[in-house]
């Protein structure tokens, strides 16, 4: 991204493009190593930064480098409130477990339990990432096929939502 962005943005602007998104990693890097975000203050069109933007401070750093905005990707997996924090709102959840349970409820309402339960395993893993005993929790969740059992596992892990969802 940092190798030829300036020339590509100039060509795009000359062709009528009104803004562009710049990812801070090259294709060869994949997800390895930190994203590199060049200063784009002199770009002829607004540039949106993408890659390794996980906090409000990361977004502020991009603004300081001349970016018109940010595009958040993997950082919101298991932490959807990050978007509010980047927007300047104090939205740290009091109980992540309640958010996970609400997310599970919405998934079941939308997809039905037979689809939602296996699909939700990855979400439970993202929400629990980095927490004590999360490895054991993920192993347990990946064996669950029943909505109430999944609800109970989430409730137990986060210490919330003692009532099952009745499915």
Annotated model-derived regions:
Residues 2-3, 31-35:
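Short, solvent-exposed loop/turn segments at secondary-structure boundaries
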Residues 4-19, 42-49, 53-167:
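Alpha/beta catalytic cores of nucleotide-metabolism and tRNA/nucleoside-modifying enzymes
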Residues 22-32:
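Glycine-rich, proline-tolerant flexible connector loops at the mouths of alpha/beta enzymes
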Residues 37-40:
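Short, intrinsically disordered, charge-balanced linker/junction segments flanking boundaries
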């Amino acid at each position: 991204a940092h190798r030829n962005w300036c020339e590509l943005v100039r060509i795009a602007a000359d062709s009528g493009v009104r803004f562009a998104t710049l990812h801070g990693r090259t294709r060869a890097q994949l997800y390895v190593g930190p994203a590199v975000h060049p200063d784009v203050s002199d770009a002829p069109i607004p540039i949106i930064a993408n890659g390794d933007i996980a906090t409000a401070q990361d977004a502020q750093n991009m603004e300081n480098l001349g970016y018109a905005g940010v595009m958040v990707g993997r950082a919101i997996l298991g932490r959807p409130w990050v978007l509010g924090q980047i927007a300047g709102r104090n939205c740290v959840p009091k109980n992540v477990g309640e958010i996970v349970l609400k997310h599970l409820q919405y998934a079941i309402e939308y997809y039905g339990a037979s689809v939602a339960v296996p699909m939700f395993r990855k979400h439970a893993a993202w929400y629990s990432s980095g927490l004590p005993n999360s490895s054991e929790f993920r192993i347990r969740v990946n064996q669950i096929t029943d909505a109430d059992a999944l609800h109970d596992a989430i409730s137990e892990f986060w210490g919330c939502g003692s009532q099952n969802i009745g499915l």
